[in-house]
Amino acid sequence: MDDATPILLVPGLAGSPRIYAPLVPALWRYGPVSVPNHIRDDHMGAIARRILAEAPPRFALAGHSMGGYIAFEIMRQAPDRVAKLALINTQARPDTLEATARRRSQIARAQAGEYHAVLDDLFAGFVHPSRLEDASLRKLVHEMGDDIGADAFVRQQSAIISRPDSRPTLAAIRCPTLVLTGDEDNTIPNSLSKEMAGGIHGAELRILAQCGHLPQVEQPQATAEALVQWLSNSVVSMPRTA
């Protein structure tokens, strides 16, 4: 990969640039690293259009959780601009009725002044069970929540609820693709990562041990190593591993 190729790292729901901070020292050697602003719109199409308007002509794209939903929308709008794709703890499916109901409840609570209680609930599903008492990770989730604010959280949830089904477009993805997840992601089961990897030609699947929904901070070294290999691999079509 050309060293000058920019790298865009899109955070997830209630996520901010802090989530990628542990990875930047390893990634910046492969190109300028930036974290797009994904908090200004309430629809995936609009979020992707704004990111594309502000992005370089061509870039490597990594999306975490909601950031993966945005990445799929970017692939629909401008596939030729994406040199490489990394899908981190995300899925291609649309929202389920159960998930939508939960999101609407979280929206109502956030608007009623219970935003930090909602962040506590999210934290419980975000981290590996062994990290539930990790005060530093809980603090990070709250700091990122404060970075975006309750109003942006509501916009993000609205965008997630209305996102399209990306499974029909998986086969059209032809750039080198990494699918990365944790072995105990209680927010998005890794079976859905396997589904994505199976639908994308040549995608590589990596499942990190002792990891939940936040691999960038739960397993930063393993995550950085996976992304460095993704960036440095010049093969157009990468093998898929179980």
Where does each model-flagged region fall?
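Conserved HGGG/HGGXW glycine-rich cap/lid loop of the alpha/beta-hydrolase fold
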Residues: 1-50
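Flexible "cap/lid" loop of the alpha/beta hydrolase fold
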Residues: 44, 76-77, 81-120
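Gly/Ala-rich beta-loop-alpha elbow adjacent to hydrolase catalytic centers
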Residues: 63-67, 71
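Conserved alpha/beta-hydrolase catalytic His-Asp/Glu region
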Residues: 95-98, 113-172
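Short beta-strand/loop motif that positions the catalytic acidic residue
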Residues: 173, 179-181, 185
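Short alpha-helix in the alpha/beta-hydrolase fold that links the catalytic acid
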Residues: 175, 189-198
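Catalytic histidine neighborhood in serine/cysteine hydrolases
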Residues: 194-213
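Catalytic histidine-centered segment of alpha/beta-hydrolase-like enzymes
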Residues: 211-224
